[in-house]
């Protein structure tokens, strides 16, 4: 089911090395009165959440997104108003899909969790996540609460590429999937097996590629909502049942988006509010930060076709807020301080590939014991990441480095296929704070550069504070800068600005990343006593 790189202008997710992203976040300051906000501003979440699926269960909205090589995968976002979002959990607790996701002999960069689907089944009050991995098979995970626990229900031999799961009004389960040729599968009543699949639509050559299926039944009609990567959205409609025949209509094409320098809103899904209004939660290409969710109201023609409501011919930067009941509580902001108390990581965090769980712990800070001996950060296990908040944000880490050993490297990175970091190195008993740049990959995601030091300074034995500031406004490469402090108050800039590229091909955007790896021998450790993600 993979396609060649020569067709990338038609579909930007067509090779083994290509894929898709996620959805979540809060835009307005925490504590802003929901009732007082008569309008909202796009993007509703300025963080990297692509390939969104969105549903409502009662008075709560949930969204799912791609995560590729990050673990746990497939975050579930929660909102009470479609505007303010939090991360509630992850549908895929561990990337249990082969050794490469453990960085064991091979690597899973830009593989893993691509566009997938989230649904709720009222008959058994269960959430379902369904997605294909590595074009080999489809996995289904279920939970009775989005926080988890999520458990694998089944694997299905057909890889449902870009799947949309529909729970029909008679409780039947259907999956729409495919690239250009769109198919519909019916699952067994228990959701464990495929009982039927057939092609239902072939995309006209004049349109090119359609993928990213979302599957709906609305007023007795069946709809498959499809994207033309990365500048269009189309919809198929059938009045004859889930297997068609379907007719196609364009929803949007080359529509001006709400973010200066960003792309066309596309993909994502439709959701209906309690009062019957409809909204489209799409994403906007906004590199170097990734793909960020944008929300627009939708109306319907008399003959049952969706129409996105525009502002001056474009996807609005602002719209009237959805009319929804007062939220039962404020959502947890996606920025702020984490002191790593308790027994688990908060769901805002995702590891680069699966972690070695014997080598980290939380409670009284985050302890990272070295898990890998390598000079290549891209091979190092237990690198812990957070999405960057746009348009600009700063990550500050308080680091206890007293248990580092010779050869260890620990710090704070701006992580993507071209990376840089500020951190503490210990060599020959000497501890320094350094900036390293030149960590690079090729387009097959193999390491081409392990980095080189561009600045350094001595540090005393006490804690050190490391800071990275990232500008992720789209449309051009943007600067990331690093600084450090020995008292937590006065910060000193270290090294030149790092240019974060805005090419889309890694799919996932830049992230802040905490790391600690050995270059000589295991046994060292660091403790992160405080992390803060802040905006100007």
Which stretches of residues belong to each language-model region?
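Hydrophobic core segments of beta-strands in well-ordered, beta-rich domains
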Residues: 55-70, 77, 108, 113-133, ...
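Structural motif
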Residues: 72-73, 137-139, 183-186, 232-236, ...
């Amino acid at each position: 089911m993979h396609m060649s790189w020569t067709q990338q202008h038609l579909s930007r997710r067509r090779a083994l090395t290509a894929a898709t992203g996620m959805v979540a976040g809060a835009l307005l300051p925490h504590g802003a009165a929901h009732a007082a906000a008569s309008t909202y501003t796009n993007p509703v979440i300025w963080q990297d959440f692509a390939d969104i699926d969105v549903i409502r269960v009662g008075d709560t909205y949930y969204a799912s997104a791609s995560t590729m090589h990050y673990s746990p995968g497939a975050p579930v976002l929660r909102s009470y108003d479609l505007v303010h979002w939090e991360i509630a959990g992850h549908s895929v607790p561990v990337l249990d899909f082969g050794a490469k996701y453990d960085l064991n002999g091979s690597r899973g960069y830009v593989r893993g969790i691509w566009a997938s689907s989230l649904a709720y089944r009222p008959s058994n009050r269960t959430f379902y996540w369904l997605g294909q991995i590595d074009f080999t098979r489809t996995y289904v995970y279920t939970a009775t609460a989005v926080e988890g626990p999520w458990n694998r229900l089944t694997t299905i031999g057909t890889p449902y590429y870009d799947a949309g799961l529909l729970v029909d009004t008679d409780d039947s389960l259907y999956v729409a999937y495919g690239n250009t040729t769109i198919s519909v599968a019916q699952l067994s009543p228990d959701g464990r097996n495929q009982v039927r699949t057939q092609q239902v639509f072939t995309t006209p050559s004049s349109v090119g590629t359609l993928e990213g299926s979302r599957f709906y039944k609305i007023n007795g009609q069946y709809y498959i909502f499809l994207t033309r990567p990365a500048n269009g959205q189309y919809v198929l409609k059938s009045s004859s049942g889930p297997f068609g025949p379907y007719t196609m209509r364009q929803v949007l094409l080359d529509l001006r988006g709400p973010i200066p320098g960003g792309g066309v809103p596309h993909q994502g899904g439709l959701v209906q509010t309690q009062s019957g209004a409809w909204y489209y939660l799409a994403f906007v290409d906004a590199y170097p930060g990734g793909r960020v969710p944008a929300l627009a109201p939708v109306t319907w023609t008399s003959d049952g076709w969706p129409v996105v409501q525009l502002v001056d011919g474009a996807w609005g930067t602002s719209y009237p807020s959805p009319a929804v009941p007062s939220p039962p509580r404020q959502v947890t902001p996606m920025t702020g301080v984490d002191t790593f108390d308790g027994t688990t990581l908060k769901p805002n965090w995702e590891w680069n590939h699966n972690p070695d769980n014997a080598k980290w712990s939380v409670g009284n800070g985050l302890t990272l014991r070295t898990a890998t001996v390598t000079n290549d950060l891209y091979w190092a296990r237990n690198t812990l990441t957070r999405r960057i908040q746009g348009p600009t944000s700063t990550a500050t880490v308080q680091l206890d480095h007293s248990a580092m050993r010779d050869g260890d490297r620990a710090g704070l990175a701006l992580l993507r296929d071209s990376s840089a970091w500020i951190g503490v190195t210990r060599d020959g008993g000497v501890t320094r704070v350094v900036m390293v740049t030149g960590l690079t990959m090729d387009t097959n995601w193999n390491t081409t550069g392990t980095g080189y030091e561009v600045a350094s300074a001595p540090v005393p034995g006490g804690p050190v504070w490391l800071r990275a500031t990232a500008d992720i406004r789209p449309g051009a490469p943007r600067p990331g800068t690093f600084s450090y402090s020995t008292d937590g108050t006065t910060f000193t800039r270290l090294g030149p600005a790092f240019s974060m590229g805005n090419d889309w091909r890694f799919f996932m955007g830049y992230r802040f990343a905490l790391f600690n790896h050995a270059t000589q021998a295991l046994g060292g450790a660091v403790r992160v006593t405080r992390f803060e993600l802040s905006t100007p």
